[in-house]
């Protein structure tokens, strides 16, 4: 944290602009061709690995970037979370056709809901057709013609004869596209601080994929046949087809929404856990950079105070299988940049614990869903210290008033089992070691909750 915060003092006090990939773990960590060993039968319903799990991503001067595909939708792999700031271009896997423009999936597979193929970004590669990613000996069933050095737009003239160029995807591809927009902005106005750059990216961003929560987002296998605005049953650990909304995130609820879609907060900003504030318009961003040059009073200082956390709750015993109010936090009359929560627990199943926050203005944000990769037996966590989460969904709101922090807790006795089926999902379940033997109450569990508002 100290090193990342120290970046604010560089570039003659204007701060380094740090653009960072969100991650490629929507469905899984360590994905193999058609399987995942990480997030069980609900993989594909929501992000397997929260982008906020990387503590660097909680720092406001880190511009966390998601990936978009050629359809204008979230790339199948792009990690989600409430710390996303912006979305760049990442594409899919480009594994078929001359240039990756085709899908190698059959019509039947596509009809089943399979996805994860299609165009991607092109970049340079190690020279020669025997080194790097672009290779003449690549498997033609999994590699497009350009990547093998044999594609031709003009008969007899190969496009990539020396395999000097390759396809590139992932949020590692999306982040450089945002860096390119930033470079254009700084070329137009080198005096911009890191906060100016981040603000202009938000101001120039456009909403994409409106209503995405009403469809499915599958990967290479049809993980889910229910839309993302469905209900998650916290007792059965199952996704239900009924449409949900944020009002169902309330104390005592046993069913909660999986995804809230694009929300408009009290400051009038639109935000999404899939896209952050959206996709920036490079031309508009440059126009704004020039406006900041013409009107320097718009500029924000590169320095930003990060307050200490405030204790919110110190609980003995924990209730699973429902939504509970963990505690409240009193905000002062500041303008919110990011709201953060920090958790410390013992004898408590982190994979069964989700966190939601409600601002004094009534905006709600899902900071973490239960049944994520921490529920998997290979990554099960029952004791944790200083586990941090954050959200930009409240950005620009007045912090004055009472903030509510909710636990969204699933059934720890119905966690996903390790992958075992040869031809599909394993439906077996495991029990978290700290789960109560029966009922929903874990009297031995402890949970300390802290919160803070990082102001603009």
Pin down the residues of each PLM region.
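C-terminal subdomain of the subtilisin-like protease fold in secreted/lumenal serine endopeptidases
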Residues: 1, 15, 61-62, 152-168, ...
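Substrate-binding/access-modulating region of protease and related hydrolase catalytic domains
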Residues: 1-59, 71-73, 158-177, 188, ...
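Solvent-exposed, polar/charged alpha-helical surfaces in well-ordered, non-transmembrane soluble domains
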Residues: 4, 8, 176-183, 195, ...
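Residue-level detector of buried hydrophobic side-chain packing
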Residues: 6, 65, 86, 172, ...
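Loop/turn elements at helix/coil->beta-strand transitions in domains of secreted/extracellular proteins
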Residues: 9-18, 59-64, 82-84, 193-194, ...
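Active-site-proximal beta-strand/loop segments in catalytic clefts of secreted hydrolases
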Residues: 20-25, 65-70, 80-81, 88-91, ...
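Extracellular S/T/G-rich loop segment that most often corresponds to the catalytic His/Ser-adjacent loop
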Residues: 45-183, 273
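Loop and turn regions of beta-sandwich accessory domains that flank beta-strands and are enriched
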Residues: 290-456
């Amino acid at each position: 944290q100290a090193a990342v915060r120290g970046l604010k003092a560089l570039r003659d006090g204007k701060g380094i602009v740090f653009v960072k990939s969100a991650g490629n773990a929507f469905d899984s960590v360590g994905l193999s061709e058609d399987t995942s060993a990480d997030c069980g039968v609900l993989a594909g319903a929501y992000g397997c690995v929260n982008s906020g799990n990387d503590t660097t991503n909680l720092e406001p001067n880190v511009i966390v970037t998601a990936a978009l595909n050629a359809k204008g939708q979230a790339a199948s792999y792009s990690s989600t979370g409430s710390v996303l700031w912006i979305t760049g271009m990442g594409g899919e896997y480009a594994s078929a056709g001359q240039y990756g423009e085709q899908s190698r999936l059959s019509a039947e597979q596509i009809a089943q809901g399979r996805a994860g193929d299609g165009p991607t970004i092109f970049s340079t590669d190690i020279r020669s057709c025997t080194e790097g990613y672009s290779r003449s000996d690549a498997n033609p069933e999994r590699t497009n013609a350009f990547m093998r050095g044999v594609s031709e737009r003009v008969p007899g003239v190969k496009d990539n004869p020396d395999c000097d160029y390759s396809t590139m995807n992932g949020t590692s591809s999306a982040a450089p596209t945002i860096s390119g927009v930033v470079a254009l902005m700084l070329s137009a106005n080198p005096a911009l601080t890191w906060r100016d750059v981040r603000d202009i990216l938000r101001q120039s961003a456009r909403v994409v994929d409106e209503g995405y929560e009403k469809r499915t987002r599958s990967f290479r296998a049809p993980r889910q046949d229910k839309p993302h605005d469905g209900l998650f049953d916290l007792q059965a650990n199952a996704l239900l087809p009924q449409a949900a909304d944020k009002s169902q995130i309330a104390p005592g609820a046993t069913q909660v929404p999986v995804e809230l879609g694009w929300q408009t907060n009290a400051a009038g900003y639109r935000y999404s856990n899939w896209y952050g504030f959206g996709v920036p318009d490079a031309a508009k961003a440059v126009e704004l950079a020039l406006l900041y040059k013409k009107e320097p009073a718009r500029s924000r200082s590169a320095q930003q105070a990060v307050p200490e956390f405030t204790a919110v709750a110190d609980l003995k015993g924990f209730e699973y299988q429902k939504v509970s109010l963990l505690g409240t936090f009193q905000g002062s009359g500041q303008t919110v940049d990011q709201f953060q929560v920090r958790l410390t627990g013992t004898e408590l199943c982190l994979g069964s614990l989700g966190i939601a926050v409600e601002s004094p203005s009534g905006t709600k944000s899902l900071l973490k869903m239960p049944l994520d990769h921490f529920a998997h037996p290979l990554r099960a966590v029952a004791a944790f210290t200083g586990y941090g989460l954050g959200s930009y969904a409240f950005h620009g709101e007045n912090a004055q008033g009472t903030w509510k922090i909710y636990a969204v807790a699933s059934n720890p006795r119905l966690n996903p089992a390790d992958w075992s089926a040869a031809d599909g999902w394993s439906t077996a379940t495991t029990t978290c070691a700290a789960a109560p033997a029966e009922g929903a109450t874990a009297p031995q569990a402890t949970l300390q909750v802290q919160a803070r508002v990082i102001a603009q």
